[in-house]
Swiss-Prot record:
Keywords: Cytoplasm, Gluconeogenesis, Glycolysis, Isomerase. The active site is at 95 (electrophile), 167 (proton acceptor). Substrate binds at residues 9-11, 173, 212, 233-234. The lineage of its organism: Bacteria, Pseudomonadati, Pseudomonadota, Gammaproteobacteria, Enterobacterales. Belongs to the triosephosphate isomerase family. The gene is tpiA. Coiled coil: none annotated. Homodimer. GO terms for molecular function: triose-phosphate isomerase activity. Involved in the gluconeogenesis. Catalyzes stereospecifically the conversion of dihydroxyacetone phosphate (DHAP) to D-glyceraldehyde-3-phosphate (G3P). This is Triosephosphate isomerase. GO terms for biological process: gluconeogenesis; glyceraldehyde-3-phosphate biosynthetic process; glycerol catabolic process; glycolytic process. Its EC number is 5.3.1.1.
Amino acid sequence: MRHPLVMGNWKLNGSRHMVNELVANLRKELAGVAGCDVAIAPPEMYIDLAKRAAAGSHIMLGAQNVDLNLSGAFTGETSAEMLKDIGAQYIIIGHSERRTYHKESDELIAKKFAVLKEQGLTPVLCIGETEAENEAGKTEEVCARQIDAVLKTQGAAAFEGAVIAYEPVWAIGTGKSATPAQAQAVHKFIRDHIAKADAKIAEQVIIQYGGSVNASNAAELFAQPDIDGALVGGASLKADAFAVIVKAAEAAKQA
């Protein structure tokens, strides 16, 4: 049985005070939670501080992006080796905000995926369609293309131990969310698509849902058989709201 993962993407939010306070509150809220893995991805300069604040708890650390290169003259970038060195394990790649604002291509994201795997880190591969693509009935086509960028260059085995986050772009930060049935249909498609290459890997891969996940819709989303947790944005900045989502994932998968 797949173990759910709920991960908080803090995006461009944080301060030393906020990190210490939020992690301290998360430790209290999540004490006793064992049936769901939990990770947080603060801005890079706060990962080490968050790691120390979370020491001794089950909270794992992640990052919001990574560069292709391990070292060299690449101003402003952060390598997989650096993230590994400071204790980040779950690395988000391909987030729609990176695809949109930084023009990151499927091919570039697949290369980042490979670098992370080589370093023993866990890629959290974000995929998902825009509102226009959704309305044009291209959801499955887009998701397949984004997955195939990895499948066709690295094979299905690359997804062993990796995480996929399905985030319909039209639902990120908008307050809109796919219905549980809509989300489940896409998650099943993603799993079935990988299964064409390797059924065992497909059955094991964690597929999160992301896109305005909150305390009120989490339980119904997690009740779906192919939804294995969530990649949470805004709600991850509030310990009580994030904890409700984590506990909903734990309860749904133990039911």
